[in-house]
Amino acid sequence: MDIADQTFVKKVNQKLLLKEILKNSPISRAKLSEMTGLNKSTVSSQVNTLMKENLVFEIGQGQSSGGRRPVMLVFNKKAGYSIGIDVGVDYISGILTDLEGTIILDQHHHLESNSPEITKDILIDMIHHFITRMPQSPYGLIGIGICVPGLIDKNQKIVFTPNSNWRDIDLKSFIQEKFNVPVFIENEANAGAYGEKVFGAAKNHNNIIYASISTGIGIGVIINNHLYRGVSGFSGEMGHMTIDFNGPKCSCGNRGCWELYASEKALLKSLQTKEKKVSYQDIIDLAHLNDIGTLNALQNFGFYLGIGLTNILNTFNPQAIILRNSIIESHPMVLNSIRSEVSSRVYPQLGNSYELLPSSLGKNAPALGMSSIVIEHFLDIVKM
């Protein structure tokens, strides 16, 4: 075996060992050898390398099953820190996490204007806020992940955001030049799907759909544990599938799009009158007070969500659909309405093969997904 091949094998072994340490900390070298099939000298050598790289450390002795007590190893989650940011239509939410995704700091801004220039200024301030308060660590800031609700191409350039009207914006290069760390740009629903897969309700599923229901509707698709992005990176824009061929005009240029009937924007519109402007918080409060008009609107909201979700279930046949929406998460009647509509329409052979679940990470799902993408890239670079 030549030197290049030996180096490659060592790196593959390091990756395998770190994966097991991440999943099973604390763990002994002997157990690592047993679980990976690598011999004890290889395990010892590669663990020493990981320790020199500050990714693994010893925490003392574990229980013995006979003979000497083993020295236990754990992953060093404080070796570096990651920033994940969710840029919505009218907000920016950011988090600083350690390498296991534990949130160390968070910050939220309401956007009075969603122009790219104003948004960039707030992003820079937020990132500076996290960096100046970040704990000391061997690797410092390992990267920044930012998601937006819109079309992201294969080069991570923002092509179009229907509800903010951003077009052809290279946010990745702009942030990378400012902070000189790896930067990742992703669609918001894809980021949310990844967050739920790594940390949340979809942890134990291989095939899931994540539906982000806010001003618009975005869908994140995970197939066999991998994000599905499509040929151009534009998959998941199912908020713009037609459910009424002769319906009203949408901002995307189509007519009768699903999100015109089943988004937060549509819900607010259905309750507003010339005399009364209704806020999202008003809807939550009125629903808790059992206001009849509000409850009827929420029932209708669930009805239209159920129609679109039925199409998605029949198309993808996932194990679960994770629903991210504050009202769905706080009002069981909306989820019940969705489930009722779906069960009455879905392909009968699907039976009970799927689950409809509220998000377990809530508003943090997209930012956690972005932080996870940054962390995975960092660990690949360090090890490979």
UniProtKB/Swiss-Prot annotation:
Protein family per UniProt: Belongs to the ROK (NagC/XylR) family.
Protein name, per record: Xylose repressor
Entries under InterPro entries matching the protein: ATPase_NBD, ROK, ROK_cs, WH-like_DNA-bd_sf, WH_DNA-bd_sf
UniProt-listed CDD domains: ASKHA_ATPase_ROK_BsXylR-like
UniProt KW Repressor keyword: yes
DNA-binding region: 29-48
KW DNA-binding (keyword) present: yes
Keywords, comma-separated and alphabetical: Carbohydrate metabolism, DNA-binding, Repressor, Transcription, Transcription regulation, Xylose metabolism
Role noted for this protein: Transcriptional repressor of xylose-utilizing enzymes.
Listed GO biological process terms: D-xylose metabolic process
Pfam families: HTH_24, ROK
Gene Ontology molecular-function annotations: DNA binding
